UniProtKB/Swiss-Prot annotation:
Pfam families in UniProt: polyprenyl_synt (PF00348)
Xref: SUPFAM superfamilies: Terpenoid synthases
Annotated pathway: Isoprenoid biosynthesis; geranylgeranyl diphosphate biosynthesis; geranylgeranyl diphosphate from farnesyl diphosphate and isopentenyl diphosphate: step 1/1
Catalytic activity: isopentenyl diphosphate + (2E,6E)-farnesyl diphosphate = (2E,6E,10E)-geranylgeranyl diphosphate + diphosphate
Keywords: Lipid biosynthesis, Lipid metabolism, Magnesium, Metal-binding, Transferase
Biophysicochemical property: temperature dependence: Thermostable. Most of the activity for GGPP synthase remains even after heating at 60 to 70 degrees Celsius for 100 minutes, although 90% of the enzyme activity is lost on incubation at 90 degrees Celsius for 10 minutes.
Annotated Mg(2+) 1 binding sites: D82, D86
CDD domains: Trans_IPPS_HT
Cofactor binding: number and manner: Binds 2 Mg(2+) ions per subunit.
Protein name, UniProt field: Geranylgeranyl diphosphate synthase
Molecular function per GO: geranylgeranyl diphosphate synthase activity; metal ion binding
Length: 330
């Protein structure tokens, strides 16, 4: 239990209620497929960041709840389509949407979620000045473009073994951090924050998102399958060029590199081959990856500390969430 549990639960429950009311309609199977991943829980980290960022600048809660729901629905849309592209079978401990409902319906479910995200954001922005509405839609739309670019780059990486660290960081700043940045900056924007504070909150989200993805890559090697909610070592099997793989290939001995490369991207790799590869990766890059995540976490806190708002509880809550991001185990 944390000091912030009641605070967080109120936000999560309100956002969940809005999502449930919006992801329903007259075509039951489509809406069932669209709502499927929401039934498995999830951290709701992005709507928490958005709502608390709004609180930080004295924003209206109901408006933030709808904007947070828009962000979470958009995030879920990306998960549905990512699982199709990565051919993943499990997400959050459940069969992925395309596995449970078939590929055509999963694609439609993703499309529906994409549209519903905009519908929710439209509701969130009602009554705001036109300039604020345009800025919010611009941030939201650009985040989708940037995420799509990041996913494409990530897929290209699967066919390369010469990825540099900066290329990886650029990729995750698009694929993952863009939506964190959208969450924190839209939250500040709809609460009336000035341009400099919106920029600082965007920087907070970007750095936090990078730290989050690095930790996610670490957990892909260290968490057990039940905690992770997907098959352990799936990143190795899929050939994902995480920071851990990049650093290992840079530092390991030639015979160790052969072991890693034999398993990397090999859909039929045995459990023993995956474990041997994972052990080598942990040996060379685990500490480095943790330190890198810590660096971006500190960058996020530095940006947060510079905002003009001195609202105590929301500021502390965002710092708590940021720390959770790098200390989490799933």
């Amino acid at each position: 239990m944390s000091y912030f549990d009641n605070y967080f639960n109120e936000i999560v429950n309100s956002v969940n209620d809005i999502i449930k009311s919006y992801i329903s309609g007259d075509v039951p199977k489509l809406y069932e497929a669209s709502y499927h991943l929401f039934t498995s829980g999830g951290k709701r980290l992005r709507p928490l960041i958005l709502t608390i960022s709004s609180d930080l600048f004295g924003g209206q809660r109901e408006r933030a709840y709808y904007a947070g729901a828009a962000i979470e629905v958009l995030h879920t849309f990306t998960l549905v389509h990512d699982d199709i592209m990565d051919q993943d079978n499990i997400r959050r401990g459940l069969p992925t949407v395309h596995v449970k409902y078939g590929l055509p319906l999963a694609i439609l479910a993703g499309d529906l979620l994409h549209a519903k995200a905009f519908q929710l954001l439209t509701q969130a922005l009602r009554g705001l000045p036109s300039e604020t509405i345009i800025k919010a839609f611009d941030i939201f739309t650009r985040s989708i473009i940037i995420i799509s670019e990041g996913q494409a780059v990530d897929m290209e990486f699967e066919d390369r073994i010469d990825i540099k660290e900066q290329e990886y960081l650029d990729m995750i700043s698009r694929k993952t951090a863009a939506l964190f940045s959208a969450s924190s900056s839209i939250g500040a924007l709809i609460a009336g924050a000035n341009d400099n504070d919106v920029r600082l909150m965007s920087d907070f989200g970007t750095n936090l998102g990078i730290a989050f993805q690095i930790v996610d890559d670490i957990l892909g090697l260290t968490a057990d399958e039940k905690e992770l909610g997907k098959p352990v070592f799936s990143d190795i099997r899929e050939g994902k060029k995480t920071i851990l793989v990049i650093k290992t290939l840079e530092l390991c001995k030639e015979d160790e590199k052969k072991i890693v490369l034999k398993a990397l991207g090999n859909k039929s790799a045995s459990k023993e081959e995956l474990m041997s590869s994972a052990d080598i990766i942990k040996k060379y890059s685990l500490d480095y990856a943790y330190n890198l995540a810590e660096k971006y976490y500190k960058n996020a806190i530095d940006s947060l500390n510079q905002v003009s708002s001195k609202s105590d509880i929301p500021g502390k809550a965002l710092k708590y969430l940021a720390e959770f991001t790098i200390r989490r185990r799933k």
